[in-house]
């Protein structure tokens, strides 16, 4: 076993190898605090026939890592949760560009989180572990790389902040890089400036270099020879001939504004060229197909670099035409149809109650994690005119949805001010690049349409890069073709005041911060243009919620009244819900949330809650219901759960022989609360609300009257039933 330990970001960080998973091609354990991850990598001995590099990354959080047992009926880990898929994507996107071009042996990277201290996140540790395991194996890999998380707490930059620190941070970025450049960025923020993002990247790169130094020191002791492999190369004569015949024709085919016209023209041209070339080279069909693809790749790139114009005729910094429709779905709480060029998203916002929040088990928290905001992104095959199998939500859909969700998260109102669970669904109806950013724009508009008081509108734009040596071009609002044949996909979302979400993937070994600085500046200009177009359609949240959305109000009740509100076996709260149609939820701190479609039922439910939990006030008049009639009076419910004695002598100024001559069970009576004794028992009076007949002598209040010997007693001697406050609780 080999091991290295250093202090990183104020805590011990350990990398070790040779103790676990020794039959894998390479393995490593990384520990930070008491969080530990195991990475194990394997490789196929033979090249895959697939036209792409078959890399698989699996990231799994073991519940035993936090001393937990999985919830549900089946007590074992199942399919990956969203956050595990997102962590796997971060690792995949960071390491994929660093495998040699042409290497197509299948590689699998497995990450297990085997200890979780609920302070330090494991995803950046997993990136370090994967890098070390690959470098310590026979797999060719142009590393090492490392990843860090950066936050800013009260103006101070923090590397690998704890979960508690992240709760106070206005920025959270995961950054991966090599010694010389950045290879991946992912994160969100609260409207921070481009300058702040760049500063965080510089700080992150310093931490990355430190972690790479640790890896290199340990790799010097354990590195093994790399496996031999041969890059498939076409014969030189075929390569030259394909370039001669294809370059001009493919460039001409590429220059079509419409996506499908372009694709059809390029494919038709390639087919015609291939048929002619096969006459000359009948045994090299595969080489000819690959070389024609290479020509397409180089022609698109050289056109942009040579002419500064793109295949659809736009300039480098030009955004496609935008059209926006809002309120397109009459029953949805908020909706928008956002179209940019040939990319279109139908986005709907739904408002729900706290009961609609998502509750998740997590090894990062002692208890459940609750999500009251969700954005779900769907990318059906018809959006690109394709036919493909549907196998549930893809990793790409989860990743794009998370990016768009994070873009909007920072501008939502506080839950205390707007106590709704919010779900946004973005259905991509057409796609020709940047559908996730269309989802951001459509999501912001749908929330405005729903009347959600966002702090500001949010827009997003996808930036691209074409780089050949020292020449490069940064492209705004990239097409699908530019994404496929370019070197970078850099998505930036935010408001007019700052960035709220960012994601960068590259296909080359890395980018220096100078290019990223230019890309951020150009992205800001594009974002402001898009925000201007959105303002023309809907500049602010609508003043009222949809008539189909629930109205929610919160009231605070004393904690000791929670039991009375709920009632025996939930009787009281169910009664309110059944009578009003409202939905009630009660928190442990006495916060009661009332939700109803329609203001009348909500107000009625609110009054009933306040009636149950309010304290009767001596001297106030109440409308009550006679619950019981006895020989000495009646018991009247003046508030739900609060019954008080209406003594026979308090029914009329004149003498009443039989209480049932005045009131009957079920009667609604108006009474005045005249007394509450030291034991909390309540006494009512009807006659106090009636004019006193002339000449009638004053009587002492009942509390001062002597006990009678005819069996008639004051209500307080009935064991407390007549005067108790909160009788509903005593009955349970």
UniProtKB/Swiss-Prot annotation:
Gene3D superfamilies: GHMP Kinase, N-terminal domain (3.30.230.70), K Homology domain, type 1 (3.30.1370.10), Nucleic acid-binding proteins (2.40.50.140)
Record's function text: Involved in mRNA degradation. Catalyzes the phosphorolysis of single-stranded polyribonucleotides processively in the 3'- to 5'-direction.
Domain KH: start-end pairs: 550-609
Principal location class: cytoplasm
Disulfide-bonded cysteines: none
Organism lineage string: Bacteria, Pseudomonadati, Gemmatimonadota, Gemmatimonadia, Gemmatimonadales
A cellular component annotation (GO) from this entry: cytosol
Species, as recorded: Gemmatimonas aurantiaca (strain DSM 14586 / JCM 11422 / NBRC 100505 / T-27)
Coiled-coil annotated spans: none
Alphabetically ordered keywords of this record: Cytoplasm, Magnesium, Metal-binding, Nucleotidyltransferase, RNA-binding, Transferase
Protein name: Polyribonucleotide nucleotidyltransferase
């Amino acid at each position: 076993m080999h091991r290295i330990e250093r202090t990183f970001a104020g805590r011990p960080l350990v990398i070790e190898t040779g103790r676990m998973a020794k039959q894998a091609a390479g393995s490593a354990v990384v520990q930070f605090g008491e969080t530990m991850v195991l990475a194990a990598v394997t490789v196929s001995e033979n090249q895959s026939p697939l036209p792409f590099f078959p890399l698989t990354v699996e990231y799994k959080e073991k519940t035993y890592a936090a001393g937990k047992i999985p919830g549900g009926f089946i007590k074992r880990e199942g399919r990956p949760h969203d956050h595990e898929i997102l962590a796997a994507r971060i690792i995949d996107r960071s390491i994929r560009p660093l495998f040699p071009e042409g290497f197509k042996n299948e590689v699998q990277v497995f990450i297990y989180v085997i200890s979780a201290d609920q302070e330090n996140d494991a995803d950046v540790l997993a990136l370090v572990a994967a890098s070390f395991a690959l470098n310590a194996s026979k797999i060719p890999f142009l590393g090492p790389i490392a990843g860090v998380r950066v936050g800013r707490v009260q103006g101070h930059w923090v590397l690998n902040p704890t979960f508690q620190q992240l709760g106070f941070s206005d920025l959270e970025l995961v950054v991966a890089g090599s010694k010389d450049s950045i290879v991946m960025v992912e994160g969100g923020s609260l409207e921070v400036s481009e300058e702040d993002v760049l500063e965080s990247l510089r700080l992150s790169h310093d931490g990355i270099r430190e972690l790479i130094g640790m890896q290199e020191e340990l790799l010097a002791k354990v590195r093994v020879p790399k496996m031999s492999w041969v890059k498939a190369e076409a014969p030189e004569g075929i390569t030259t001939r394909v370039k001669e015949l294809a370059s001009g024709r493919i460039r001409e085919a590429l220059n079509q504004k419409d996506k499908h016209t372009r694709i059809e023209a390029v494919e038709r041209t390639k087919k015609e060229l291939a048929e002619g070339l096969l006459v000359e080279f009948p045994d090299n069909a595969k080489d000819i197909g690959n070389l024609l693809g290479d020509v397409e790749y180089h022609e698109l790139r050289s056109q942009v670099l040579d002419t500064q114009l793109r295949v659809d005729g736009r300039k480098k910094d030009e955004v496609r035409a935008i059209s926006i429709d809002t309120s397109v779905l009459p029953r949805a709480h908020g909706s928008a149809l956002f179209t940019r060029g040939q990319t279109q998203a139908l986005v709907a916002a739904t408002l729900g109650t706290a009961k609609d929040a998502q509750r998740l088990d997590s090894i990062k928290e002692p208890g459940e994690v609750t999500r009251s905001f969700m954005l779900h992104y769907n990318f059906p095959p018809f959006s690109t005119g394709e036919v493909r199998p549907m196998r549930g939500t893809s990793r790409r859909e989860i990743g794009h949805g998370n990016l768009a969700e994070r873009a909007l998260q920072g501008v939502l109102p506080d839950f205390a001010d707007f106590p709704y669970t919010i779900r946004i669904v973005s259905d991509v109806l057409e796609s020709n690049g940047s559908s996730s950013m269309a989802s951001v724009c459509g999501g912001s508009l749908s929330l405005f349409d729903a009347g959600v008081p966002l702090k500001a509108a949010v827009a997003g734009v996808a930036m691209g890069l074409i780089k050949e040596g020292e020449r490069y071009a940064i492209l705004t609002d990239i097409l699908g073709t530019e994404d496929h044949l370019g070197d970078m996909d850099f998505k930036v979302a935010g408001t007019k005041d700052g960035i709220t979400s960012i994601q960068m993937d590259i296909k080359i070994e890395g980018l220096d911060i100078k290019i990223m600085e230019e890309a951020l500046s150009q992205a800001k200009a594009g974002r402001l243009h898009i925000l201007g177009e959105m303002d023309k359609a809907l500049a602010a949240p609508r003043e009222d919620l949809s008539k189909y959305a629930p109205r929610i109000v919160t009231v605070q009740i004393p904690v000791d009244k929670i039991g009375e509100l709920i009632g025996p076996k939930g009787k009281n709260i169910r009664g309110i819900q059944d009578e009003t149609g409202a939905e009630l939820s009660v928190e442990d701190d006495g916060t009661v949330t009332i939700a109803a479609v329609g203001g009348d039922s909500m107000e009625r439910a609110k009054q009933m809650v306040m009636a149950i939990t309010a304290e009767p006030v001596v001297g106030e008049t109440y409308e009550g219901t006679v619950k019981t009639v006895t020989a000495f009076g009646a018991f009247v419910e003046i508030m739900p759960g609060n019954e008080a004695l209406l003594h026979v002598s308090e029914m009329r100024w004149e003498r009443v022989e039989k209480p049932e001559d005045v009131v009957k069970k079920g009667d609604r009576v108006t009474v005045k609360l005249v007394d509450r004794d030291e034991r909390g028992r309540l006494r009512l009076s009807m006659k106090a609300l009636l004019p006193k007949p002339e000449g009638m002598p004053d009587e002492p209040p009942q509390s001062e009257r002597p006990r009678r010997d005819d069996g008639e007693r004051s209500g307080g001697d009935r064991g407390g039933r007549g005067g108790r406050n909160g009788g509903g609780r005593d009955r349970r």
